[in-house]
Swiss-Prot record:
Keywords associated with the record: Cytoplasm, Isomerase, Porphyrin biosynthesis, Pyridoxal phosphate
Family statement: Belongs to the class-III pyridoxal-phosphate-dependent aminotransferase family. HemL subfamily.
Cofactor: pyridoxal 5'-phosphate
N6-(pyridoxal phosphate)lysine, modified sites: K267
PANTHER family: GLUTAMATE-1-SEMIALDEHYDE 2,1-AMINOMUTASE (PTHR43713), GLUTAMATE-1-SEMIALDEHYDE 2,1-AMINOMUTASE 1, CHLOROPLASTIC-RELATED (PTHR43713:SF3)
Keyword Isomerase: yes
Gene name of the record: hemL
Pathway: Porphyrin-containing compound metabolism; protoporphyrin-IX biosynthesis; 5-aminolevulinate from L-glutamyl-tRNA(Glu): step 2/2
EC assignment: 5.4.3.8
InterPro entries for the chain: 4pyrrol_synth_GluAld_NH2Trfase, Aminotrans_3, Aminotrans_3_PPA_site, PyrdxlP-dep_Trfase, PyrdxlP-dep_Trfase_major, PyrdxlP-dep_Trfase_small
Gene3D superfamilies per UniProt: Aspartate Aminotransferase, domain 1, Type I PLP-dependent aspartate aminotransferase-like (Major domain)
Localization per record: Cytoplasm
Assembly, per entry: Homodimer.
Protein's UniProt name: Glutamate-1-semialdehyde 2,1-aminomutase
Length: 429
């Protein structure tokens, strides 16, 4: 493939954008090489500035569940922009969006719109601290909740040690308020609550880890956290920015049958536009200003164009059988990838929940961040580039989930698997 225009653009971008990008993973640092620059997208495909076409399994990191540039979403945006781009005042679409979310996610009795997933998680944690009068939070290895200071923390040597910052600029005093656990560790969660339970405002978790590739919860794990939070008076926050409306119509909480106190959303509810939301029990949400004393605001929150796009997308995912078909297509892809790897003599396993999937270069079932980081990253990187050269775009990191859309039909999946058979053969050489 020719990437001359992308190469020139990346060189130009590095003179005016830190690292040449506006989000680190886009720079291909994890896999090596240089990123391609996208000119347009349609259905299951991306087209770069050099005219190359790629089958896309990133889907803008999750929101494009019905495929890129879906006519219903595009037309909703076109209608909305005729009336204006931003009002800074209430509009009918934000009420409809809130009613839609509360109708689909029973744990959310009220919703507040924001502008990003990061903003949603930051706001939910502030609400949890304000509502409980406590300051500490618990998060999990491999779970990403945006770039807020409280979330850029990893565990020290042992589960009960204080958190230490993973980014310069995060005050140590703030990071000490975040404790980190291993995902799917039942005993560790119990022990940590026994140690610091009265200080914990909230547990925040990706119910399916999507930022350490794709790691589902073990049976009963989310319910175990629900029980611990209830017992110790802490709130349970599900970060459903990735999983919301993707793994099931009601999100991971519906899929696993566990009810959080607060939930955060993004991606799909904007149909590709910048958006976020958090919601939960009425008694909690009514503590947010102006109804209550816990402050949170945003100039562009409830933006009418983003609301129009999101409402159109949510109509699409409510079509009968949508999630069943999406899950079946994702399963077909995963089984085909494993078969192709097996034929090439390469150890590969997959995880899948609904329209999310993960590809791991290992024989082991991956159920933790430690297992994910122990996989053969070098082979993944070689496979990534071999697929890219064959016109298939996977997430440019071994630690990111893949995303299926309803536009990935049987023909697209077979083309992907044909490329994978050749790519695995390259890796095996």
């Amino acid at each position: 493939m020719n990437h001359s225009r992308s190469h020139a653009l990346f060189a130009q971008a590095q003179t005016v954008l830190p690292g040449g990008v506006n989000s680190p993973v886009r720079a291909f640092k994890s896999v090596g090489g240089e990123p391609f620059f996208v000119a347009r997208a349609d259905g299951s495909y991306l087209f770069d500035v050099d005219g190359n076409r790629y089958i896309d399994y990133v889907g803008s990191w999750g929101p494009m569940i019905a495929g890129h540039n879906h006519p219903a979403v595009r037309e909703a945006v076109e209608r909305a922009i005729r009336d204006g781009l931003s009002f800074g005042a209430p509009c009918a679409a934000e009420v409809t969006m809130a009613e839609t979310i509360t109708g689909l996610v029973p744990s959310c009795e009220m919703v507040r719109m924001v502008n990003s997933g990061t903003e949603a998680t930051l706001s939910a944690v502030r609400l949890a601290r304000g509502a409980t009068g406590r300051n500490r939070i618990i998060k999990f290895e491999g779970c990403y909740h945006g770039h807020g200071d409280s979330f850029l923390v990893k565990a020290g040597s042992g589960m009960l040690t204080l958190g230490v910052p993973t980014s310069p600029g995060v005050p140590a005093g703030l990071s000490e308020l975040t404790a980190t656990l291993s995902f799917n560790d039942f005993e560790g969660a119990t022990a940590l609550f026994d140690e610091i339970g009265p200080e914990v405002a909230a547990v925040i978790i990706e119910p399916v880890v999507g930022n350490a590739n794709c790691i589902p919860p073990q049976a009963g794990y989310l319910q175990h956290l629900r029980t611990l939070c209830t017992r110790h008076g802490a709130l349970l926050i599900f970060d459903e920015v990735m999983t919301g409306f993707r793994v099931a119509l009601g999100g991971a909480q519906a899929h696993y049958g566990v009810t959080p106190d607060l939930s955060t959303f993004g991606k799909i509810i904007g149909g590709g536009m910048p958006v976020g939301a958090y919601g939960g029990r009425r008694d909690l949400m009514e503590q947010i200003a102006p109804a209550g004393p816990i402050y949170q605001a945003g100039t562009l929150s409830g933006n009418p164009v983003a609301m129009a796009a999101g409402l159109a997308m949510l109509e699409l995912v409510q079509e009968p059988g949508f999630h069943m078909r999406l899950s079946e297509a994702t399963s077909a892809l995963c089984e085909g990838l494993k078969d192709a790897a097996r034929t090439a003599g390469i150890a590969v396993t997959t995880n899948q929940v609904g329209g999310m999937f993960g590809l791991f270069f290992t024989d082991d079932i991956v159920e933790s961040y430690a297992q994910a980081t122990a996989c053969d990253i070098t082979s993944f990187n070689r496979f990534f580039h071999a697929m890219l050269q064959r016109g298939v775009y996977l997430a440019p990191s071994a630690y990111e989930a893949g995303f299926m859309s309803s536009a990935h039909d049987a023909t697209v999946i077979e083309a992907t698997l044909a490329a994978a058979r050749d790519a695995f053969a390259d890796v095996a050489r």
